[in-house]
Regions:
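Core dinuclear metal-dependent hydrolase active-site scaffold
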Residues: 164-196, 201, 208
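Short catalytic-loop micro-motif centered on adjacent basic/acidic residues
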Residues: 31, 50-53, 77-81, 180-181
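Active-site metal-binding motif and surrounding structural segment of the metallo-beta-lactamase
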Residues: 17, 25, 47-48, 59-106, ...
Length: 215
């Protein structure tokens, strides 16, 4: 299907959808969007913050840290990765000073793209999919958000998880906040959602976003 004036419509969609936003969802919970290719959720605990995803680069992670300090006056004590894609983990290095626990879930089946041949194919597909060879004027956006920091030479600062769960569901109380972490494979085999029952807040990672299909 061909779309008339497709670039203009994409530009209008991007301008309407991907402005930097720090939205208070409810008391003690903020949704941060428009800072990159992914979002982050700040959950304020008794003495520290629980952070769901870390954005895609060290530079953007540092900006997120300044927002967290501004909103809460607290440091990050726990990071939860909703899944292993780099745009959700690339900012983790910005939070090392507070020595956070970092939680992730293990994939249930083998991650095939880690094999040599498929990794090369995946990398080439990603280069085309996200328009890394395009200028800002040509790219407009990456569909589900502004361009990743990598497109501007920003450093990804991955930090391995300190706790990896193999279960399908884990419930924990962290900093006085009850968190239900549930495995729900989507873009990846390790994808989880995080439900905060007391706040009635669901952190769904890339299992749901306002752009379909993600081309």
């Amino acid at each position: 299907m061909l779309i008339e004036q497709g670039s203009q419509k994409l530009r209008e969609f991007t301008e309407a959808s991907y402005q930097e936003t720090h939205k208070k969802i409810t008391d003690g919970v903020w949704h941060i969007s428009g800072l990159g290719h992914s979002n982050a959720v700040i959950i304020e605990g008794e003495s520290k913050v629980i952070l769901v995803d870390t954005l895609d680069s060290l530079e953007r992670g540092k900006k997120l840290l300044s927002i967290i300090r501004e909103k809460t006056g607290k440091e990050v004590g726990t990071i939860i990765y909703t899944h292993g894609h780099p745009d959700h983990r690339g900012g983790a290095g910005a939070f090392l000073e507070s020595n956070p626990e970092i939680i992730a879930f293990a994939p249930k089946s083998a991650v095939l793209e880690r094999t040599g041949l498929l990794r090369d194919i995946q990398n080439l597909r990603g280069y085309r999919q996200f328009g890394y060879g395009l200028t800002d004027e040509e790219n407009i956006s990456q569909g589900i958000g502004p361009r990743e920091g990598e497109a501007y030479g920003e450093q990804r600062a991955f930090v391995p998880p300190s706790v990896v769960y193999g279960q399908d569901q884990v419930t924990r109380e962290i900093e006085g906040v009850c968190l239900e972490m549930l495995r729900l494979p989507g873009e990846t085999e390790d994808q989880i959602m995080v439900w905060v029952p007391e706040k009635k807040v669901l952190c769904c990672g890339d299992n749901y976003y306002g752009c379909f299909p993600n081309l």
